Amino acid sequence: MNELTFTYKNWKGEISERRIDVHSINIYYGEVEWHEGEQWLMEAIDLDKNDFRTFAIKDIIGEFSLDFIK
């Protein structure tokens, strides 16, 4: 499976490493319950939680890591 790994700060301020399926990525401008105010969002399957999650692009820390590009 092709995955994208990044460091992310969630709405509670907790920082963790996240892994998502690159084939499930949907990037859009909008607002959702956990990310108030219109902004760029990325929805994707979180491989560790085995469920779709929405990430605020502004809360991604540092660089992305793609497992299939080495």
Located regions from the model:
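Core beta-strand-centered patch of the WYL/Sm-like small regulatory domain
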Residues: M1-K70
